[in-house]
Regions:
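Short amphipathic alpha-helices in soluble, non-transmembrane regions
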Residues: 30-41
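Acidic Ser/Thr/Pro-rich low-complexity disordered segments
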Residues: 49-50
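Single conserved hydrophobic/aromatic residue that forms the stacking wall/gate
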Residues: 1-8, 12
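C-terminal helical cap and adjacent loop that interface with cofactors, partners, or active-site loops
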Residues: 24-25, 41-45, 54, 61-124
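Metallocofactor- and cofactor-centric catalytic cores in central/energy metabolism, strongly enriched
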Residues: 3, 33, 68
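Conserved glycine-rich beta-strand-loop-beta hairpin in the small C-terminal domain of fold type I
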Residues: 14-19
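Residues that form or flank phosphate/diphosphate-binding pockets in enzymes
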Residues: 1, 28, 105
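Histidine- and/or cysteine-centered catalytic micro-motif in compact active-site loops
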Residues: 9, 23-27
Length: 124
């Protein structure tokens, strides 16, 4: 079981940011979380869809990242950028993440969904 808390905001600069708080039944190490993010491959990556980012989740080690202005176009705007992973006093961990509103969240997300449905045979 995983417990997740989330505080999100949409920025006037075309991006969504979230502060994520997460707890697990068995707390992983920080290194295990970073490894899971680095190795994550969803259906879009497994099927090598045209609009899919090669690396869906990007973790930034810098303490001031992710930043919408600097990171919104990671993987042509189709990645989720993560940073500031640290232990929390109430939850196991907290971290920040952001994505491009239009490219990942709306238009690009819709195109990627259509590619996935086509690859899975829903239009046959």
């Amino acid at each position: 079981e995983i417990l997740i808390g989330l505080v999100g905001s949409e920025m006037c600069i075309r991006d969504s940011t979230a502060a994520v708080f997460v707890s697990f039944d068995k707390k992983p190490t920080k290194e295990q979380m970073l490894e899971a993010w680095a190795n994550f491959r969803g259906p879009a990556q497994e099927l090598d869809l045209p609009s899919a980012p090669k690396q869906f989740l990007h973790y930034f080690e810098e303490n001031d990242r992710p930043q919408p202005k600097l990171d919104r176009n990671t993987e042509h705007g189709m990645a989720v950028c993560i940073g500031r992973l640290r232990e929390d006093t109430l939850f196991d961990y907290k971290f920040a993440c952001m994505s491009h509103n239009t490219l990942r969240g709306a238009a690009g997300g819709a195109v990627l969904l259509a590619e996935l449905l086509a690859a899975k045979g829903y239009f046959d």
